[in-house]
Swiss-Prot record:
Physiological role: Transaldolase is important for the balance of metabolites in the pentose-phosphate pathway.
Catalytic activity: D-sedoheptulose 7-phosphate + D-glyceraldehyde 3-phosphate = D-erythrose 4-phosphate + beta-D-fructose 6-phosphate
Family indicated by similarity: Belongs to the transaldolase family. Type 2 subfamily.
EC number: 2.2.1.2
GO BP, sorted A to Z: carbohydrate metabolic process; pentose-phosphate shunt
Cysteine disulfide links: none
Active site: 140
Native source species: Pseudarthrobacter chlorophenolicus (strain ATCC 700700 / DSM 12829 / CIP 107037 / JCM 12360 / KCTC 9906 / NCIMB 13794 / A6) (Arthrobacter chlorophenolicus)
GO cellular component assignments: cytoplasm
Top-level taxon in the UniProt lineage: Bacteria
Protein name: Transaldolase
């Protein structure tokens, strides 16, 4: 019997796991997800690494070794995260080979404190890429205004990029433009475009969480009827943008030179509101050529009872536009919401990073005392 995750794969959706830890690597649980649940990639972020590193004892030996070597807290975190990502890249290498690098990808994010620093982001991206030293790594760069130029410059060096924290259609257009500009420069620099890969991580459930709060405050029947619809509408219109901007003459020239399109990646796909189906942001966002990165809870729910009915995105654009128009008429400002979500998203990652710095600093101090 075909499983729902197999059906997603057959419909053109690549399933990535939104989580990574040394425990997953050493116990074989990540390998099991590849073998049994069609997982073909991994994404990480500062919050994921904070949770992994501060839970249990998996990293104690590494911290002790770093303490003995006199490493700083930043050097220790860099060593831990890049080692985990490199090991995951090795695990996914057969997938990468089988898909010619399209899947089998593992993402690692630049220090989130650099989100507003173009040159700092470029330098960090190169440093991470060199340290991990795996062809199937993706360097995650936030889609801030300052990040757009860094995305172009990083791609121009032949480095594959995961653009993250995209909430608005306008910013998504700018991201695709930055991607195509990066490939144009990479071509001029003599890089093989067929070896440069990219995804654009478009966040879904957080849009509903914020807009639903505003709809609850309005409280009318019309407002309540729109709950749980904005995230899907926004993502579906993003796919329309993807179709539009990868059907241009500009893109045709790059494709002729061997370039592959930057795939939309649905992120923030765990359902926050228990009133909604737990597979909402998976089964309702099926379209050819997309990635869906899921926390394990969402992956398990999809595998267990997800109902995959084929493409649920193409042809939905009129309804999606109508949803966003109805929200504006009720006084829910799309531009205000997406700007807030970008700011909050960055703040959360910076906060997680600072907590991680403090926790690892404490662990290093304890290790030095013990020795």
């Amino acid at each position: 019997m075909t499983t729902p995750t197999q059906q997603l794969s057959e419909a053109g959706v690549s399933i990535w796991l939104d989580d990574l830890s040394r425990g997953r690597l050493e116990t074989g649980t990540l390998r099991k997800l590849i073998e049994e649940k069609n997982v073909v990639g991994v994404t990480t972020n500062p919050s994921i690494f904070h949770a992994a590193i501060t839970a249990g004892t998996d990293y104690d030996a590494t911290v002790a070794a770093q303490a003995a070597a006199g490493a700083s807290v930043e050097e220790t975190i860099f060593e831990i995260t890049t080692t985990d990502v490199a090991d995951a890249c090795d695990l996914f290498a057969p997938v990468a080979a089988a898909t010619k690098g399209v899947d089998g990808r593992v993402s690692i994010e630049v220090d989130p404190r650099l989100a507003w620093d173009t040159n700092g982001t470029i330098a960090e991206a190169k440093h991470l890429y060199k340290k991990v030293n795996k062809d199937n790594v993706l360097i995650k760069i936030p889609a801030t205004i300052e990040g757009l130029e860094a995305i172009t410059a990083t791609l121009a060096e032949g480095i594959s990029v995961n653009v993250t924290l995209i909430f608005s259609l306008e910013r998504y257009r700018a991201v695709i433009n930055a991607f195509q500009a990066g490939l144009e420069q990479a071509k001029e620099n003599g890089h093989d475009l067929s070896k440069i890969h990219s995804v654009a991580s478009f966040f879904v459930s957080r849009v509903d969480s914020e807009i639903d709060k505003r709809l609850d405050k309005i409280g009318t029947d019309e407002a309540k009827a729109l709950k749980g619809k904005a995230g899907l509408a926004n993502a579906r219109l993003a796919y329309q943008v993807y179709e539009e901007l990868f059907a241009t003459e500009r893109w045709a020239l790059l494709a002729e030179a061997g370039a592959l399109p930057q795939r939309p990646l649905w992120a923030s796909t765990g359902v926050k509101d228990p009133a909604y189906p737990d597979t909402l942001y998976v089964t309702e966002l099926v379209a050819p050529g997309v990635v869906n990165t899921m926390p394990e809870k969402t992956l398990d729910a999809t595998f267990d009872h997800g109902v995959v009915t084929g493409d649920t995105v193409s042809g939905t654009y009129a309804d999606a536009n109508a949803t966003l128009d109805a929200l504006e008429k009720l006084g829910v400002s799309y531009n205000e919401v997406v700007a807030l979500l970008e700011s909050e998203g960055l703040d959360k990652f910076v906060a997680s990073w600072k907590e991680l710095l403090a926790d690892v600093e404490g662990a290093l101090a304890s290790a030095r005392k013990a020795s």
